[in-house]
Curated annotation (Swiss-Prot):
Primary role: Involved in the latter stages of the biosynthesis of the alpha-(1->6) mannan core of lipomannan (LM). Catalyzes the addition of alpha-(1->6)-mannose residue.
Lineage: Bacteria, Bacillati, Actinomycetota, Actinomycetes, Mycobacteriales
Topology relative to the membrane: Multi-pass membrane protein
Record note on disruption phenotype: Cells lacking this gene show a complete loss of LM biosynthesis. Mutant results in the formation of a truncated LM with a reduction of alpha-(1->6) and alpha-(1->2) glycosidic linkages.
Keyword vocabulary terms for this entry: Glycosyltransferase, Membrane, Transferase, Transmembrane, Transmembrane helix
Compartment list: Membrane
Any one GO cellular component localisation term in the record: membrane
Organism: Corynebacterium glutamicum (strain ATCC 13032 / DSM 20300 / JCM 1318 / BCRC 11384 / CCUG 27702 / LMG 3730 / NBRC 12168 / NCIMB 10025 / NRRL B-2784 / 534)
Family: Belongs to the MptA/B family.
Protein name per Swiss-Prot or TrEMBL: Alpha-(1->6)-mannopyranosyltransferase A
GO terms, molecular function: glycosyltransferase activity
Length: 490
């Protein structure tokens, strides 16, 4: 249904495209577009329903016995394939960002600087598909993002359709790599890999926005996931290098690096303790191990990012653009939510209350909270490998809640890790409900419904019902991805 609805109700081309080539343009207008939107919406509900049913089956089996982990993992994988395969052939949906990616790559190809110039400086077929809001906006992404776009547009020229296909392939690779590594991280910590894959990769937010929307988070999250896995397997330099590659794609990946330093420190300190004939490291081993791994991490990151920046032909202007663009305002970002509530109350008393002034102040305060929260997370989750990965997820949560701009696909970095570290059941419940809610909040064309009260209420009810269906037999005090002990089985 998502596949069928995408060609009339998705983020389709303004000019040309598959419908135009087939003489089916009427599907994108009038009543036919309404039908396409309905089909797409039904597809969203069916995708969510399949995910909920799968979750219910997993958690019922988890409560009943612990004998079918391999079968459960196979079931999740087969369901994931069934979700992804139809979307391979679907049009872009829930976002027009893929057209901006192509445009930015074409700018680098044609000698423009996307860090100082907007897409409008390079007219052509790709510019026509870029959302009007972003035609005069610089890119917040790293040099690898531009390099990939440069290579794709060099190969496909100005053929937008082929460019979209190329990004679809990259998105699928990114999600596949994420799934591969998440299963192994969960196994490393003794967590249930089936549930980790269910909540972290088969999640409707991941499917809809990573494959349907083709966001560069898909590749970034894949690189970070493999980097974390390598670090856990005592391949610190390789792990940091891969995460550094992800940083050069999108700076958000850098949040994981300080926690990888903790992982590397524990490994190196353990090695130093073993050389001294001790079972566990002392502070004397931990302190030099910390500085050694920290210095190595900084050096490797600097070399990798510098090499990619140089090889891509892009400038260092991406450093100044890391903060992103402040045009996007929605309640997913805490400062926007607070400013909206303040304005709603204030307008009762002041007719011309200035929302922009309020949101600017709240964003500044929220940014300080975010920076403080990241430091606190880094320090609190330093004790061992598992705590470091948990801290990575916590830090991503802090960053996305308190950042000035937040969009659903940003949460891919957090969602992917949720099932790997044996989280408490309440966290999985909350994540499942929030995932269903967020998955329902965007239309196929890419417009959010977060200010549509009726839609928000309906989505909230559906999300609540989903959690009831999935977890009706589970104890909220238990650990979500840990296999139950034999004595707990009735």
């Amino acid at each position: 249904m998502l596949l069928l609805g995408s060609f009339g109700g998705g983020a389709i081309r303004y000019r040309g495209g598959v419908l135009d080539a087939l003489g089916l343009n009427f599907l994108a207008f009038g009543h036919a577009q309404g039908i396409s939107n309905t089909v797409l919406w039904v597809g969203q509900l069916l995708l969510i329903g399949a995910w909920v049913h799968l979750g219910r089956r997993l958690f019922k089996k988890k409560v009943a016995d612990d004998t079918a982990d391999a079968a459960d993992l196979g079931l999740v994988k087969r369901t994931l394939y069934a979700m992804v395969v139809p979307l391979i052939f679907a049009a872009p949906m829930m976002s027009r960002d893929v057209y901006s990616y192509l445009m930015q790559g074409a700018m680098l190809r044609d000698g423009f600087d996307p860090y100082t110039e907007g897409a409008a400086v390079n007219p052509g077929p790709m510019l026509l598909e870029v959302s009007h809001d972003w035609r005069n906006t610089t890119t917040p992404y790293g040099p690898l993002h531009l390099w990939i776009g440069d290579m794709i547009t060099t190969v496909v020229g100005d053929n937008v359709t082929l460019g979209v296909v190329a990004y679809k392939i990259l998105s699928i690779i990114g999600l596949a790599v994420t799934g591969w590594s998440i299963v192994r991280i969960a196994q490393h910590f003794g967590a249930n890999p089936a549930i980790a894959l269910w909540i972290g990769v088969a999640n409707p937010v991941m499917i809809i926005h990573m494959i349907g929307g083709m966001h560069n988070e898909s590749l970034m999250v894949g690189l970070v996931s493999v980097g974390l896995l390598l670090a856990l397997k005592k391949r610190f330099v390789a792990g940091v290098a891969l995460i550094a590659v992800a940083v050069s794609l999108k700076a958000t990946a850098a949040i994981a690096l300080p926690f990888v330093v903790w992982i590397g420190m524990h490994h190196f300190a353990g090695f130093l303790a073993t050389k001294k004939g001790k079972d566990s490291p002392t502070l004397k081993q931990q302190v030099p191990a910390f500085f050694a791994t920290g210095a190595a991490g900084v050096a490797v990151t600097g070399v990798v990012v510098s090499a990619i920046t140089w090889a891509s032909g892009a400038s260092w202007g991406w450093i100044s653009e890391i903060s992103g663009n402040s045009k996007v305002i929605n309640p997913l970002a805490f400062p926007s939510l607070v400013a909206s509530v303040i304005t709603m109350v204030a307008e009762v008393f002041v007719d011309d209350f200035d929302y922009n002034a309020v949101v600017n102040v709240v964003r500044s305060i929220s940014m300080l909270i975010m920076l403080g929260g990241l430091v606190v997370c880094w320090w609190l989750f330093r004790q061992n490998e598992r705590r470091a990965v948990t801290g990575t997820a916590a830090a991503y949560a802090v960053a996305f809640v308190f950042n000035s701009v937040t969009l659903p696909w940003y949460y891919a970095s957090l969602i992917s890790l949720l099932g790997t570290f044996k989280p408490p059941m309440w966290l999985i419940r909350f994540a499942a409900g929030a995932s269903v809610f967020i998955a329902l909040m965007f239309t196929g064309s890419g417009n959010h419904q977060l200010y549509n009260i009726v839609t928000v209420i309906i989505a909230a009810i559906i999300a609540w019902l989903a959690t009831v269906v999935i977890f009706d037999d589970t104890d909220p005090a238990t650990t979500a991805t840990e296999k139950p002990s034999p004595h707990t089985v009735s």
